[in-house]
Swiss-Prot record:
Residues 102-198 are annotated as: Disordered. Residues 102-113, 133-148 have a biased composition (Low complexity). The keyword Nucleus applies. Transcriptional activator. Binds a GC box motif. Could play a role in B-cell growth and development. This is Krueppel-like factor 6. A zinc finger (C2H2-type) spans 200-224, 230-254, 260-282. Its main location: nucleus. Interacts with ZZEF1. Pfam families: zf-C2H2 (PF00096). GO terms for cellular component: cytoplasm; nucleus. Gene3D superfamilies: Classic Zinc Finger. It comes from Rattus norvegicus (Rat). InterPro entries: Znf_C2H2_sf (IPR036236), Znf_C2H2_type (IPR013087).
């Protein structure tokens, strides 16, 4: 049968328990459902084959008329577009404004990358084609990346260094000192946000990173040498790290310390990046 019986297994067991047997013959309800199914199959529309000779097309003259009308409508729309007043002056002024804003945004992104990038192989950041041309021509030096701290104590130092909060970006006016014409003369990507020059350079082959602090340079050079001087003092733990902030973050796993607290709720986290991910839920 195409339709399953409506009675459940519990009803079948009840019938067997009461009568001692179960009849396999279909009931009136099952006959009725089977009849409804057969009627639906019989009455539904079936796909039929249509030969190509039965397909009717419009007359050839009607087709040509439709094509000519469509062509005329297209020409009229083109004439309307061409008769509209020129907007070259508006486009040029908007383009110049976009160039200025893009240059400001590229400077902000390059400076903010100094405080957020982990120690890694040399990477060049170019936010637009104009920046790429300047880098290739030698007007800009290589990308400058500093070591971002992950512990809350050093985060305070970095926020004081920038003169703003941990989650705030410096304004373009603070980052760009002087006009756009003078920025090429100072030429450099060697100037730090607070005005000091980056004098500590990595001398390993192929690496051109520059830092303002010798401690940051030493921490970076350990990525080349593989040195890990910071050892976990927890009993039974022999983990070693190249940077002190990595050891601090690892040590919180033993102590269970969670110094990063959410300002919207009472949840605390042991790492600042975990707190940043959690804060996105409140947005």
């Amino acid at each position: 049968m195409d339709v399953l019986p409506m009675c459940s297994i519990f009803q079948e067991l009840q019938i067997v328990h009461e009568t001692g047997y179960f009849s396999a013959l279909p009931s009136l309800e099952e006959y009725w459902q089977q009849t409804c199914l057969e009627l639906e199959r019989y009455l539904q529309s079936e796909p039929c084959y249509v030969s190509a000779s039965e397909i009717k097309f419009d007359n050839q003259e009607d087709l040509w008329t439709k094509i000519i009308l469509a062509r005329e409508r297209k020409e009229e729309s083109e004439l309307k577009i061409s008769s509209s007043p020129p907007e070259d002056s508006l486009i040029s002024s908007g383009f110049n404004y976009n160039l200025e804003t893009n240059s400001l945004n590229s400077d902000v992104s390059s400076e903010s990358s100094d405080s957020s990038e982990e120690l890694s192989p040399t990477t060049k950041f170019t936010s637009d084609p104009i920046g790429e041309v300047l880098v290739n021509s030698g007007n800009l030096s290589s990308s400058v990346i500093s070591t971002p701290p992950s512990s809350p104590e050093v985060n305070r130092e970095s926020s004081q260094l920038w003169g703003c909060g941990p989650g705030d970006l410096p304004s373009p006016g603070k980052v760009r000192s002087g006009t756009s014409g003078k920025s090429g003369d100072k030429g450099s990507g060697d100037a730090s946000p607070d005005g000091r020059r980056r004098v500590h350079r990595c001398h390993f082959n192929g690496c051109r990173k520059v830092y303002t602090k010798s401690s940051h340079l030493k921490a970076h050079q350990r990525t080349h040498t593989g040195e890990k001087p910071y050892r976990c003092s927890w009993e039974g733990c022999e983990w070693r790290f190249a940077r002190s902030d990595e050891l601090t973050r690892h040590f919180r796993k033993h102590t269970g310390a969670k110094p990063f607290k959410c300002s919207h709720c009472d949840r605390c986290f042991s790492r600042s990046d975990h707190l940043a991910l959690h804060m996105k839920r409140h947005l």
